[in-house]
Design a protein with these regions (language model features):
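Well-ordered alpha/beta subsegment
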Residues: 121-145
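Short, solvent-exposed amphipathic alpha-helical segments in soluble enzyme
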Residues: 24, 52-55, 107, 124-127
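Short, charged/polar "capping" segments at the starts of alpha-helices
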Residues: 43-47, 117-118
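Hydrophobic/aromatic beta-strand patches that form the interior of the parallel beta-sheet core
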Residues: 7, 91, 108, 136-138
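Conserved RecA-like P-loop NTPase helicase motor core
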Residues: 80, 84-96, 104-108, 112-125
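Structural motif
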Residues: 36, 76, 90-91
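Long, hydrophobic N-terminal alpha-helical segment
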Residues: 1-44
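Helix-adjacent hinge/juxtasegments
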Residues: 49-86
Length: 145
């Protein structure tokens, strides 16, 4: 059964979501995970890719898009057929619950304080429960930066 974690951020802006993604990806890669980040569009995937390559002044997070030949520990896709054949960890930044979600061993949802994102998150939380997955909540609003 997959482990699903919802990270509730204190901010409403997308930038904080991408900053947290960089931290989460760094920890996951250090722990030996291969990440698949699912987005809603190619444009958003490219934007996230750029952010990860420039994640911090002293490091970068190697990643690739399905349209590239590069084999990196982070794959960023936007269509169901982009999901890897050997799924490990999913970071779902899309507005949907991909049907292959239950095939991953770890799942992360990064939630910002936007009305649209919060409404989608409530729906996805129920979808996880419907799939037999009991999500864990991590309220980052209660932690200092």
């Amino acid at each position: 059964m997959p482990q699903a974690d919802f990270y509730i951020l204190p901010s409403a802006d997308e930038d904080s979501r991408y900053q947290f993604l960089g931290k989460l990806a760094t920890r996951a890669i250090s722990a030996g995970h291969w990440l698949y980040i699912h987005t809603d569009s190619e444009h958003l995937a490219e934007r996230i890719s750029e952010r990860l390559w420039q994640s911090s002044p002293e490091s970068f997070l190697a990643n690739s898009l399905p349209t590239e030949k590069l084999h990196a520990p982070i794959l960023i896709g936007w269509q169901p057929d982009h999901i890897p054949n050997t799924p490990d960890m999913l970071v779902n930044l899309s507005t949907i619950f991909p049907s292959q979600t239950v095939e991953f061993s770890r799942i992360a949802e990064i939630v910002i304080q936007s009305d649209e994102i919060l409404a989608l998150t409530r729906g996805r939380f129920k979808e996880y429960q419907g799939a037999g997955i009991q999500p864990r909540m991590h309220d980052m609003r209660k932690r200092s930066s």
